[in-house]
């Protein structure tokens, strides 16, 4: 019987996940299909019950359901539990629903694919304190990045993650701007304002260190205002596309046991999104 998978969210129209997973199914001769499902917050419980009843083998979860879905699941893996957020659900052969979060590990794989894995002792500045920030901070810590600093408009939110995870320290945006030259890797983890065109830089990059690596988790647009400003300062930039592809590939592996070809997918999506 043909397996089927989905992505649930609100909005969902612009998701690249269906095209990505269906291309992988075809490439790997997997009898499966992947569909986008628009699910509002009010419909979430009914949607999970429906997915289960209709025999979905698994699904991805996007905004705004990553935390709200947790009560409907039977188990969480350690990373999802630590983050309090789920982006991948696996339905076991016994019908159990297990929640995973592949965002943080997907980011680390993307970063190391772009710049190598020899930067683990370098000072890292993480900008933002939302769900994505929590996952990336935890995954970087797990993967051996030992010098992490978080900054956020509301410092208390960054401090809460630092305290909970026992990582580094939290500083204000003002201090981040003043001490920017100290950091070798800067990761921009907020998407506020991008969709509406009201994005404002969290701080000036005038003090950016020569040879710094600057990453953004947003993949559409590929060149965010933050990355544009960093590139003008001579930084090595890492777009959010690699993270998107790798988090999807890790989900694919949870569902089917094989890791798909991420390189060709990054090239393909890069062309679609107008990259070089």
From Swiss-Prot:
EC number, UniProt record: 1.1.1.25
Q: Which GO terms describe its molecular function?
A: NADP binding; shikimate 3-dehydrogenase (NADP+) activity
Keywords for the protein's UniProt record, in alphabetical order: Amino-acid biosynthesis, Aromatic amino acid biosynthesis, NADP, Oxidoreductase
| Residues at the catalytic site | 66 (proton acceptor)
The pathway this protein participates in, as annotated, is:
Metabolic intermediate biosynthesis; chorismate biosynthesis; chorismate from D-erythrose 4-phosphate and phosphoenolpyruvate: step 4/7
Source superkingdom: Bacteria
Reactions catalysed: shikimate + NADP(+) = 3-dehydroshikimate + NADPH + H(+)
Instruction: Summarize where shikimate binds, as residue positions.
Output: 15-17, 62, 87, 103, 219
Which biological process terms from the Gene Ontology are attached to this UniProt entry?
Answer: amino acid biosynthetic process; aromatic amino acid family biosynthetic process; chorismate biosynthetic process; shikimate metabolic process
Q: Which residues bind NADP(+)?
A: 78, 128-132, 217, 240
Q: Name one GO cellular component term.
A: cytosol
TM spans (from-to): none
Q: What's this protein's family per the entry?
A: Belongs to the shikimate dehydrogenase family.
UniProt cross-references to NCBIfam families, sorted A to Z: aroE, PRK00258.3-3
Q: How does it assemble?
A: Homodimer.
Function text: Involved in the biosynthesis of the chorismate, which leads to the biosynthesis of aromatic amino acids. Catalyzes the reversible NADPH linked reduction of 3-dehydroshikimate (DHSA) to yield shikimate (SA).
Name the HAMAP family for this protein: Shikimate_DH_AroE
Query: What is the designated name of this protein?
Result: Shikimate dehydrogenase (NADP(+))
